[in-house]
Amino acid sequence: MEGEVATNGVILKHNGVKDISLETCWPEKKKPVEATSLSSGSSDIEEEISVECPKRVANQRRKRSKADEIKTKSSRKRKCDDENKCEENEKKQRSSVKKRATTWKEEEVVVDDEKKCEQQLQLVPSSKATSRSRSKKSVSVDTWLVNNEIDVSALSSRSESELSDSYLKTEYFNDCRSMTRSLKANLGELAICHQCSKGERRYLFICTFCEVRLYCFPCIKKWYPHLSTDDILEKCPFCRGTCNCCTCLHSSGLIETSKRKLDKYERFYHLRFLIVAMLPFLKKLCKAQDQEIETEAKVQDSMASQVDISESLCSNEERVFCNHCATSIVDLHRSCPKCSYELCLNCCQEIRGGWLSDRPECQLQFEYRGTRYIHGEAAEPSSSSVSEDETKTPSIKWNADENGSIRCAPKELGGCGDSVLELKRILPVTWMSDLEQKAETFLASYSIKPPMSYCRCSSDMSSMKRKAASRDGSSDNYLYSPDSLDVLKQEELLHFQEHWSKGEPVIVRNALNNTAGLSWEPMVMWRALCENVDSAISSNMSDVKAIDCLANCEVKINTLCFFEGYSKGRTYENFWPEMLKLKDWPPSDKFENLLPRHCDEFISALPFQEYSDPRSGILNIATKLPEGLLKPDLGPKTYVAYGTSDELGRGDSVTKLHCDMSDAVNILMHTAEVTLSEEQRSAIADLKQKHKQQNEKELQEQNGLEEEEVVSDEIVVYDETSGALWDIFKREDVPKLEEYLRKHCIEFRHTYCSRVTKVYHPIHDQSYFLTVEHKRKLKAEFGIEPWTFVQKLGEAVFIPAGCPHQVRNLKSCTKVAVDFVSPENIDECLRLTDEFRQLPKNHKAREDKLEIKKMVIYAVEQALKEVETLLLDRS
């Protein structure tokens, strides 16, 4: 019997198996488990907390009638002859209440002693967190809840309208104080705050959900400003999964990172889709190796099947790179027996073809002309000069012999120039060819039909689309922009794949809505890093190396000062905004270890986890590398940067135009807006005029150019949720974009605000940021424009490999990004790998950090293993 199943746009035919219906496996929502009480009276108190019992109603009526009685007496007193004295007494009473009472949203005022206590509260709570076991503390808490006369649930059930009355405010806080005294009397040393581990707090609030944890008022106000004390009583931050105390922040496994579990049928279809996509590239790699073996057979004057290839000694923890082009070597390569110089197969072909590039070293250096020049004034006498040697060095000859053999590289290129390079292997003999044959055999049993179209963006669905460009006659001016809830559906994954295969960016809205809500305040993250970690790491966290966006240089700054500037802003002496940014902080190789909860929270927020999950994404080729093999650093990486909504034109908080070798997804986790004063705005306007005059003078002196007036025609709109402005270019427009940048390179500034005079690669140099004016000129001269859109808080932006992009921060932003490798973009990854190897030596983008060829072969191997296991389970 023959059946068909469709997934990922692929139709599977199989023999002897019944038709399989592809159903999305939705994890059932677990109901919160009610806290079990260890005392005999726990059921009574739970009933009293959960329902509106007659006793509570009578209690509340009695309190309201008492409040009405007080109001009546107060009104009668106003009619007495001693009216002035009564008013004076009332003022004193109100003043006393204001010092003692607390409201949830508008008037949270603490008594003087509490203020002193809050001032004494250290920025970083004590790292000596006490472990509180359920077995000991829960019994005491349960006993206290049963025997205590204070109605905790009645406190949490009152509305703001009830608490607006002064009498009820006072009574409420007296009850809270009485509750705290009772807690301390019954629990003793265990009556401590879960957040700061201190027991001398005046107000402690117990969670009625877990009946275990307590939080003090200063910690609630400082670390959980979005929660009221009623919220804490109902469900504490720990039970909500948002506790940011040091102990919890260093705990892993508390957050479920996977949103949707795949059943075995879905896994089978995804793996088959991956094998289909990878096989053509595996064949190319095998073909290149077969050609090299045939060449070696000619050198040895033997048959290809008789060529003996010795194994190169290489461990799994070692990366092997070509000494000439810095490309990763996967299997076959040539090596010098004398000096161990190693050459990849691509370089071997280029030597035999006679088109090998010398790849000279990059000599780019920018001249420092002083801080006055950076701010638009005259340059200071230069103490340094630009060391660019424009004289062309003679080309070094490196040719192959007539039989195809290649000698070691000349000494000028790092070799010895003496011995003939020998053919070496890293993998077992015929391992790759056997893998290719195995994949072909597997796919031969199944037929493939053209995929169906799942795109519904052509219909009137404004919620799924976002306008990002105004290209004439183009059908891709709108970007696919689903909600995070929609992406959990199987049909939306197919919808995503259709846009993704075209090289289009994707924006997913509200990615943080499905997370626990952990705080991404930079101060919370910094506190977690400074406590409960190795002392050496903790000491290194006191200072950070940030990038000054104006001079484009690293500056060392105190970590606390940096984060204060994140929320309050920083300026130079002339009131020009100082824009600083931290890249990859903390380092991504330590991010998961130092901030495990934040790492789990980020992964749980990732949409389309079949692609983006860095741990177990079934269509993420980077996850297929076997254990023990050295893996590339793909993140997650954190980016913390200042920002302002107005485009300054010089020193903006930006990520300059660049192109990533792999796919990436970037989520805006936190923003903070810094308001500029009128004095600062006036100073900025004056300084912009100085910058303009400086530009006009320099351009006139160099090329007779004149700076044009900026006329903005951008379609983006900013609002309170806006965070970052993105410009992403189409792959097809890259040649025209590069031509424009080479033509106008002198108009751009980079390090020390010096003009860009030398271009090695207009995109990979990362020296350019296109302002509004440059984007207008680009469209006028070359007819191309990027997708331009604003990333809002909680939005995830998917960037395909090979799409040049730039970002400008409209506010202080905390973004987290992770790289991944999708089957649809393997061809682009390989193209970029070859493009990077053509860059000069010591160019920052030259190294093959991705090792995409290695990923391809191991992805096919791992997918075949998993498919075989699934087939055995089905049989």
Swiss-Prot record:
InterPro entries: JHDM2-like, JmjC_dom
Keyword Nucleus recorded: yes
Gene Ontology MF, one: zinc ion binding
Binding locations of Zn(2+) 2: C207, C210, C236, C239
Region (Disordered): 31-103
Tissues where the protein occurs: Expressed in inflorescences, roots, siliques, leaves and stems.
Role: May function as histone H3 lysine demethylase and be involved in regulation of gene expression.
Protein name: Lysine-specific demethylase JMJ26
Organism taxonomic ancestry: Eukaryota, Viridiplantae, Streptophyta, Embryophyta, Tracheophyta
Name of encoding gene: JMJ26
